[in-house]
Amino acid sequence: MTNSSMFCPIYRDLEPFTYFFYLVYLIGIIGSCFATWAFIQKSTNHRCVSIYLINLLTADFLLTLALPVKIVVDLGVAPWKLRIFHCQVTACLIYINMYLSIIFLAFVSIDRCLQLVHSCKIYRIQEPGFAKMISAVVWLMVLLIMVPNMVIPIKNIKEKSNVGCMEFKREFGKNWHLLTNFICVAIFLNFSAIILISNFLVIRQLYRNRDNANYPSVKSALLNILLVTASYIICFVPYHAVRIPYTLSQTEVISDCSTRIALFKAKEATLLLAVSNLCFDPILYYHLSKAFRLKVTETFASPQKMKAREEKPRRENDVQSTGSAC
């Protein structure tokens, strides 16, 4: 370990971030619990989007398990063993959630694209059985990438206040961490391209059919696309703009102390945006899942509005959620 890394106070002054992480956690746990209750109460016919959203919700619960530990550690009040546990386990859970969220948002975009652009044809990818299979493959892939960071043996170091997770790693652990980061950036870039291309094709199709009587819900569909795209960009793009430079500072390719401190603070700020997907996801559930939307309406609408809603004939087939294929 070099003198620069030994005496560079990188991991100080994290308390301001913890308040925002706590706010995200509080909003997110309420939204996730309500979403779970809504999906359980309202039986769904397991359309593709519903399957992907349920997987997204499951990933969000991993994040709700990890955030309290991160908050306690960053406040500097965690015992030494909890700090080690955070570096080995809960920090990895945060990234498992992040990349599962990215991948399942991409599958939501693909499904909506096929529903609207190729509405007369059903592809295998649109079948519920295939959606369940691909979801299992996604979980397995992400876990195979991330779990080694949890189980690779770590070093025993003397207890101190200003310590980062990389300092616990042996040489093989550092190399695997570096490899994991580059794999995750590749996942981000590939699935970002999928989301952007899918949404572009949907917008183009909606624009071409803007005067068609069969497209009465164009505005709602566009709103859904904008929600998915905006939440994706806000949550995940800033973090990945910082991730590679920050990883290089962890491996001391970037050794200047002030630069390393700035990159760490930028990483924490953009990680805060990334975990804020925990707050955005319930909004996506509302717009993309009919079961969730109906349960929210039943819970918060007045009896008069509910009665009027029940008397109102169904004029749409949930264009804004998944379409008709699955």
From Swiss-Prot:
The keyword Transmembrane applies. PROSITE patterns: G_PROTEIN_RECEP_F1_1 (PS00237), G_PROTEIN_RECEP_F1_2 (PS50262). Residues 41-48, 111-133, 204-221, 290-326 are cytoplasmic. Residues 307-318 have a biased composition (Basic and acidic residues). The keyword Cell wall biogenesis/degradation does not apply. GO terms for biological process: adenylate cyclase-modulating G protein-coupled receptor signaling pathway; G protein-coupled receptor signaling pathway; negative regulation of myeloid cell differentiation; regulation of feeding behavior; regulation of sensory perception of pain. It is found in: Cell membrane. Residues 305-326 are annotated as: Disordered. Keywords: Cell membrane, Disulfide bond, G-protein coupled receptor, Membrane, Receptor, Transducer, Transmembrane, Transmembrane helix. It is a multi-pass membrane protein. It holds the Pfam family 7tm_1. Residues 1-19, 70-89, 155-182, 243-268 are extracellular. Disulfide bonds join C87-C165. GO terms for cellular component: plasma membrane. One of its GO terms (molecular function) is neuropeptide binding. The chain crosses the membrane at residues 20-40, 49-69, 90-110, 134-154, 183-203, 222-242, 269-289. G-protein coupled receptor for Big LEN, a 16-amino acid neuropeptide produced from the precursor protein, proSAAS (encoded by PCSK1N). Acts through a G(i)-alpha-mediated pathway in response to Big LEN. Big LEN-GPR171 system plays an important role in regulating feeding and metabolism. Also plays a role in modulating fear and anxiety-like behaviors in the basolateral amygdala. Big LEN-GPR171 modulates the mu-type opioid receptor signaling and antinociception. Acts as a negative regulator T cell function. Belongs to the G-protein coupled receptor 1 family. This is G-protein coupled receptor 171.
